[in-house]
Amino acid sequence: MVNLRNAVHSFLVHLIGLLVWQSDISVSPVAAIVTDIFNTSDGGRFKFPDGVQNWPALSIVIIIIMTIGGNILVIMAVSMEKKLHNATNYFLMSLAIADMLVGLLVMPLSLLAILYDYVWPLPRYLCPVWISLDVLFSTASIMHLCAISLDRYVAIRNPIEHSRFNSRTKAIMKIAIVWAISIGVSVPIPVIGLRDEEKVFVNNTTCVLNDPNFVLIGSFVAFFIPLTIMVITYCLTIYVLRRQALMLLHGHTEEPPGLSLDFLKCCKRNTAEEENSANPNQDQNARRRKKKERRPRGTMQAINNERKASKVLGIVFFVFLIMWCPFFITNILSVLCEKSCNQKLMEKLLNVFVWIGYVCSGINPLVYTLFNKIYRRAFSNYLRCNYKVEKKPPVRQIPRVAATALSGRELNVNIYRHTNEPVIEKASDNEPGIEMQVENLELPVNPSSVVSERISSV
């Protein structure tokens, strides 16, 4: 036990030395200890950096820390902010979990492989496990974005059906399906690797997936097919949003199913004739004003909100596309042109492109911060250690009061908190009165404030 503790201590000291020490400092005893440890286990070898400090390794450590921390903030925000409790943000939280696990389990071991010149320094049975985790979390990220794009399109195309079946339970079921597909793609890797080590080792030293058939099939299933679905659904989403916005802008709405266009025109014409006969002296300005009031402002605001959300998700999708496309394209080319391509160049490109893909896991929280006010405020509070959940002010019940409204449209009721007596303001004496019961009102208690309520009399 003492020897194991000393070995672990020596390894950690030496790992820090790999990151910050210069080569002219004498650390040969520590290097010799760690070299002996790995030489006795798996024949690994240590290559000490030459000349200057290993700044690339330090930058990778910073990327790992930012990836883990940023995605933890996303998970906290969706968990604690009630405004973020919807299906899309549940998907984003699950995506953040996958990205956080990339930073915890995949990126550190990849950094370790870089520090040892891509010679696997750990026990050999851990190599297929690490590759499987890499494929699992990367595939999960892609599948989450694909599921989000499909969910957004359905929500915009059929909002009534989507809202009817879009509960928290349904969202969790969809997320479970995404993870099940990702696990199904990654599970064969440890099975293949433990049976035949040549499938996960190159030159018996470098831990990398070395099965051409699995590389081809896995790349298409885990990346290119979901990518095609995302591109199509995102284009359709933009098309539907633009069409709905244009229809509302010109005062048209989509006709309900089962009603013909002639029937709608007839109804509109009859309605217009009745209004003209009932109000022959109504001026043209009043008609225009009514037409503007009938325009569904709430629907237009909802479309604007959907457009903003689609913009943020589109940026996430575009960043993901830019980050992962080089790796998967190079991965396919390395298999298809195995004899004609320069394999050493392909290996170097893959080593660079895979880290560009890893960086994508840390960029998503930055996108949310820049383009979403709720996430930005939540992140700011959490970084200042402010985890308090906003509570609603206490409510107080106002006694039931009967009132007669003399206005055919609205009734203004001023309630003074220090007396609890409603004061009714008559809007007009020219229109017939409508008897109305004012029900119990629950309003926040604030003795120094005066609350003015506008209550519809219909």
Swiss-Prot record:
Changing residue 457 to A: No effect on interaction with MPDZ. Glycans are attached at residues 39, 204. Changing residue 160 to V: In RNA edited version. GO terms for biological process: behavioral fear response; cGMP-mediated signaling; chemical synaptic transmission; feeding behavior; G protein-coupled receptor signaling pathway, coupled to cyclic nucleotide second messenger; G protein-coupled serotonin receptor signaling pathway; intracellular calcium ion homeostasis; locomotory behavior. The chain crosses the membrane at residues 56-80, 87-111, 129-151, 168-189, 214-236, 312-336, 348-370. Pfam families: 7tm_1. SUPFAM superfamilies: Family A G protein-coupled receptor-like (SSF81321). Its main location: membrane. One of its GO terms (cellular component) is G protein-coupled serotonin receptor complex. A motif (NPxxY motif) lies at residues 364-368. Detected in brain. Residues 33-55, 112-128, 190-213, 337-347 are extracellular. Disulfide bonds join 127-207, 337-341. SMART domains: 7TM_GPCR_Srsx (SM01381). Interacts with MPDZ. Interacts with ARRB2. Interacts with MPP3; this interaction stabilizes the receptor at the plasma membrane and prevents the desensitization of the HTR2C receptor-mediated calcium response. Belongs to the G-protein coupled receptor 1 family. This is 5-hydroxytryptamine receptor 2C. It comes from Homo sapiens. The lineage of its organism: Eukaryota, Metazoa, Chordata, Craniata, Vertebrata. The gene is HTR2C.
